[in-house]
């Protein structure tokens, strides 16, 4: 048990990071029925912004700037790439999302020269080492799941208690009827992207605290795993995305703990195939029927 404990701790931490990304997938899909393929790339951009700002600015300026820039990027993507295609076939939206993903990667390649950027100044305090249950780890390992759960509670309260949250629930339930009832769909969708981008920025700062560099491909694997978590839990369901993320994080680390780290990534994508074959709606998802 002592040997597996560090892997369990790391698994909970990884699950929290995946959850913050997965919520963005599930929020957008819940309203637009769109898989935002650029989501992982926004995560990568947040990491690069963190690298550049923390290296040259005080932390009390750098951290809010990372959040602000990532939110602006998410908002701009929605307005420029998705809003003009609101009434277009769903395939057009998907192609646009793929195009945005490649655009972000190429812009990042131009800025960085294709070189991974070193994290010169990790965020203080959370990057410090601590001893937990007799094992040495970084404080971010403990902070991540606590902060993730706190943000999820805040998000659920926002969705249930605020006017914009009511609009999000209405649009997710029936997009066309919500429009007819006077819900400001454009504002609702923009806020959805803003929230998802904010959570991604938080997740990126936590995630890249554990890594020495950030490159243009750094958002690929976390983004894909978060997508699997969203599908596993039931894409469109916030609790499902969170549960799926924590389960995947734990399973991956347990596989590493038993000496099969080579197969930890393979397990995640094998799980995606199994879920799609056995229960396509996921653990908490509801079957969606298209209206004629």
Language-model-detected regions and their locations in the chain:
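Helix-loop-helix "hairpin" substructures at the membrane interface of multi-pass membrane proteins
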Residues: 14, 133-214, 238-243
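Residues that define the loop-to-transmembrane-helix transition and helix capping
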Residues: 38, 60-61, 91-92, 163, ...
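Transmembrane helix-bundle core of multi-pass membrane transporters
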Residues: 84-161, 188-191, 254, 259, ...
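Membrane-interfacial amphipathic/re-entrant helices at transmembrane-helix boundaries
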Residues: 1-20, 49, 60-61, 88-93, ...
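Membrane-embedded helix boundary and interhelical linker motif in transport proteins
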Residues: 9, 31-76, 80, 85, ...
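Alpha-helical transmembrane segments within multi-pass membrane transporters and channels
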Residues: 58-100, 107, 243-248, 279
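Transmembrane alpha-helical segments in multi-pass inner-membrane proteins
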Residues: 18-22, 57-68, 190-200, 206-270
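Hydrophobic core segments of alpha-helical transmembrane domains in multi-pass membrane transport
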Residues: 47-52, 67-73, 100-108, 147-156, ...
């Amino acid at each position: 048990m002592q040997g597996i404990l560090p892997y369990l701790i790391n698994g909970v931490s990884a699950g929290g990071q995946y959850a913050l990304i997965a919520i963005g997938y599930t929020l957008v899909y819940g309203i637009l029925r769109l898989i935002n393929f650029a989501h992982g790339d926004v995560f990568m951009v947040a990491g690069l912004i963190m690298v550049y700002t923390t290296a040259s600015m005080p932390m009390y300026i750098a951290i809010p700037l990372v959040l602000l820039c990532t939110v602006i990027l998410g908002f701009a993507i929605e307005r420029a790439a998705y809003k003009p295609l609101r009434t277009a076939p769903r395939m057009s939206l998907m192609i646009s999302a793929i195009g945005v993903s490649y655009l972000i990667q190429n812009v990042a390649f131009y800025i960085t020269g294709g070189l991974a950027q070193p994290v010169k100044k990790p965020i203080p305090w959370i990057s410090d080492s601590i001893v937990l249950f007799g094992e040495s780890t970084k404080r971010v390992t403990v902070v991540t799941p606590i902060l993730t759960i706190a943000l999820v509670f805040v998000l659920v309260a926002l969705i249930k208690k605020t006017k914009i949250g009511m609009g999000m629930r209405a649009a997710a339930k029936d997009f066309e009827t919500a429009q007819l009832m006077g819900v400001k769909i454009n504002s609702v969708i923009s806020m959805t992207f803003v929230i998802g981008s904010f959570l991604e920025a938080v997740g990126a700062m936590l995630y890249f605290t554990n890594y020495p560099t950030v490159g243009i491909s750094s958002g690929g694997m976390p983004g894909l795993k978060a997508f699997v978590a969203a599908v596993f839990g039931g894409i469109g369901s916030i609790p499902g995305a969170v549960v799926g993320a924590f389960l995947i994080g734990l399973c991956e680390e347990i596989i590493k703990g038993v000496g099969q780290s080579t197969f930890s990534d393979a397990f995640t994508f094998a799980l995606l195939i199994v879920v799609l074959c056995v229960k396509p709606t996921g653990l908490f998802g509801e079957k969606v029927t298209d209206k004629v």
